[in-house]
């Protein structure tokens, strides 16, 4: 009698072990896997937006609408080494925040109805963006102005949301209206330490962050070497990144300046824009 009972016990024990394995698998899938996924997602996300002049993104946060102004991300895309290869899609030249479902390509009562700053044609102006402490993935950045008012006007009408095709046409116009680093006399315009001569990123009309693995003042925060919280980000505090650009000999009572940051480490691009006048 002992042998059959022993065999039955072994069968039941094997089934018990299988049940425990299934239960533990379900616990992992339901509890630990999402936490791991969230942790990984948080660790690889880059974050930043235009700060000066006050971008629509900044105004969205200051109005209490945008909970994460640094989170308007175009992803996943090829952001490196070709800086202009990725289509902008719904992000357009002004950015789209999926977290709060905000499309900054369309004006509202909180942004886009008026110019936030007025400049003169050909003026050299200070521009600044804000990079999050936990989201600094290096790379290169630039500022652009589209000089086709008929294109820009589609982004100044609060009753109209530009289509993706119109957003891409605008992005192409902004790319053509790049404001080169080299146009400002005396400004340092180096090449990215993370780019190799011959690659598409080997250019100094764009601005570059410091080397991603630099031992001194690395990545984008190393450009100003400013204190943490020198600008606002919702995740871990921000650092300013400040440069100068020379405006074109062009006039408009209401136009846009667009900021674009291509991340080196991740396949992400950040876009934001500010409403300005050039008179």
Swiss-Prot record:
Disulfide bonds join 68-71, 94-273, 130-231, 146-173, 181-189, 195-201, 209-220. The modification Methylhistidine is found at residue 47. The chain crosses the membrane at residues 24-46. It comes from the Eukaryota. It is a single-pass membrane protein. It is found in: Membrane. GO terms for cellular component: membrane. CDD domains: AA13_LPMO-like. Keywords: Copper, Disulfide bond, Glycoprotein, Membrane, Metal-binding, Methylation, Transmembrane, Transmembrane helix. Binds 1 copper ion per subunit. Glycans are attached at residue 253. Its cofactor is Cu(2+). GO terms for molecular function: metal ion binding. Its main location: membrane. Residues 47-276 form the Chitin-binding type-4 domain. Cu(2+) binds at residues 47, 137, 270. Lytic polysaccharide monooxygenase-related protein that has no activity towards starch. Catalysis by LPMOs requires the reduction of the active-site copper from Cu(II) to Cu(I) by a reducing agent and H(2)O(2) or O(2) as a cosubstrate. Belongs to the polysaccharide monooxygenase AA13 family. PANTHER family: BINDING PROTEIN, PUTATIVE (AFU_ORTHOLOGUE AFUA_1G14430)-RELATED (PTHR36575), CHITIN-BINDING TYPE-4 DOMAIN-CONTAINING PROTEIN-RELATED (PTHR36575:SF2). This is Inactive AA13 family lytic polysaccharide monooxygenase. The lineage of its organism: Eukaryota, Fungi, Dikarya, Ascomycota, Pezizomycotina.
């Amino acid at each position: 009698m002992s042998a059959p009972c022993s065999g039955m016990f072994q069968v039941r024990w094997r089934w018990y072990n299988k049940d425990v394995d299934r239960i533990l698998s379900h616990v992992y899938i339901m509890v630990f896997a999402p936490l791991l996924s969230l942790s990984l997602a948080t660790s690889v996300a880059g974050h930043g937006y235009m700060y000066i002049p006050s971008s629509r993104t900044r105004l969205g946060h200051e109005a209490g609408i945008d909970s994460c102004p640094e989170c308007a991300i175009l992803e996943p895309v090829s952001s490196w080494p070709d800086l202009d290869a990725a289509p902008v899609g719904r992000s357009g030249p002004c950015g789209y925040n999926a977290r709060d479902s905000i499309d900054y390509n369309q004006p509202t009562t909180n942004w886009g109805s008026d110019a936030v700053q007025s400049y003169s044609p050909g003026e050299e102006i200070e521009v600044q963006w804000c990079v999050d402490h936990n989201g600094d993935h290096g790379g290169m950045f630039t500022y652009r102005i589209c000089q086709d008012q008929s294109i820009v006007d589609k982004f100044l009408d609060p009753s109209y949301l530009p289509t993706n095709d119109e957003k891409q046409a605008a992005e192409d116009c902004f790319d053509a209206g790049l404001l080169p680093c080299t146009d400002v006399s005396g400004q340092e315009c180096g090449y990215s330490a993370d780019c190799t001569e011959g690659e598409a990123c080997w250019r100094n009309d764009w601005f570059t962050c410091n080397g991603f693995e630099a031992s001194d003042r690395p990545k984008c925060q190393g450009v100003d070497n400013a204190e943490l919280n020198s600008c606002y980000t919702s995740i871990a505090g921000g650092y300013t990144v400040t440069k100068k650009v020379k405006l074109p000999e062009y006039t408009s009572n209401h136009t846009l300046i667009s900021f674009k940051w291509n991340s080196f480490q991740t396949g992400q691009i950040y876009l934001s824009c500010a409403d300005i006048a050039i008179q």
